[in-house]
Curated annotation (Swiss-Prot):
Location in the cell: Cytoplasm; Nucleus
One GO biological process term: proteasome-mediated ubiquitin-dependent protein catabolic process
Family to which this protein belongs: Belongs to the peptidase T1A family.
Family annotation (PROSITE patterns): PROTEASOME_ALPHA_1, PROTEASOME_ALPHA_2
Keywords: Cytoplasm, Nucleus, Proteasome
Species this chain originates from: Spinacia oleracea (Spinach)
Highest classification ranks of the organism: Eukaryota, Viridiplantae, Streptophyta, Embryophyta, Tracheophyta
Primary location class: cytoplasm
UniProt xrefs under SMART domains: Proteasome_A_N
Signal peptide start-end: none
Domain of life assignment: Eukaryota
Classification via InterPro entries: Ntn_hydrolases_N, Proteasome_alpha, Proteasome_alpha-type, Proteasome_asu_N, Proteasome_sua/b
Designated name of the protein: Proteasome subunit alpha type-3
Length: 249
């Protein structure tokens, strides 16, 4: 970065001469160094998957979760600094609870995404704060059907058919674009997301990983739940077989 060391990267409130805010770019870099998180919108719901890198062999399986429930009908996948992600999840839960207490119904996914994005953006406006070093994929089911959003460290949010963040995001996006999501069920989507995460994982450079998955669909009664173990094992087996077949070619 051309302006490193010249003082333009010392505060989130300082623009460089070419219009960049380096603190936000550094936060985005923290996300890019994280395990890959993928979300897809299928015809009957949302599937979220995360490549959770295992930092130590002594860690218990299932610890330091990267996928969290925000509300009955919405969930969030986190890439980047896990502690920052927990703070965003806590804020999202608070916003969802507050909306329901005021309006008497579950918060729409778009409203929740906008509120989370505004909170993330707030931390890019004042010199005594730092940007969140994480990005999140938010999936949910409301009166408009299944919806998928991604919130970046800059505080911007977009609605997607399929989204990916983290170390393997470019390769994951390429694979997502090949899928016919409008014709795919969540059961099929679970297998495809597992295949994508296994494919983008670099065994030579990356640590071992744990596949974490959840869904919000008609089969889960439109509630955010972990993918059942039998379906998760089936997806892992299909992903491993696809990877071995690709290596054989």
């Amino acid at each position: 970065m051309s302006s490193i060391g010249t003082g333009y990267d010392l505060s989130v409130t300082t623009f460089s001469p070419d219009g960049r805010v380096f603190q936000i770019e550094y936060a985005a870099k923290a996300v890019d160094n994280s395990g890959t998180a993928v979300g897809i919108k299928c015809k009957d719901g949302i599937v979220l998957g995360v490549e959770k890198l295992i930092q130590s062999k002594m860690m218990l399986p299932g610890s330091n979760r990267r996928i969290h429930s925000v509300h009955r009908h919405s969930g969030m996948a986190v890439a980047g600094l896990a502690a920052d992600g927990r703070q965003i999840v806590a804020r999202a839960k608070s916003e969802a609870t507050n909306y329901e207490s005021v309006y008497g119904e579950a918060v729409p996914v778009k409203e929740l995404a906008d509120r989370v994005a505004s909170y993330v953006h707030l931390c890019t406006l004042y010199w005594w704060l730092r940007p969140f070093g994480c990005g999140v994929i938010l999936g949910g089911y409301d009166r408009d059907g299944p919806q998928l959003y991604m919130v970046e460290p800059s505080g911007i949010s977009y609605r997607y058919f399929g989204a990916a963040i983290g170390k393997g995001k470019q390769a994951a996006k390429t694979e997502i674009e090949k899928l016919k999501l409008s014709e795919m069920t969540c059961r099929e989507g679970i297998i495809e997301v597992a295949k994508i995460i296994y494919k983008v994982h670099d065994e030579a450079k990356d640590k071992a990983f744990e596949l974490e998955m959840s869904w919000i669909c008609d089969e889960s009664k439109r509630e955010h739940q972990k993918v059942p173990d039998n379906l998760l094992q089936e997806a892992k087996a299909a992903a491993t077989a696809a990877l071995e077949e690709m290596d054989a070619d």
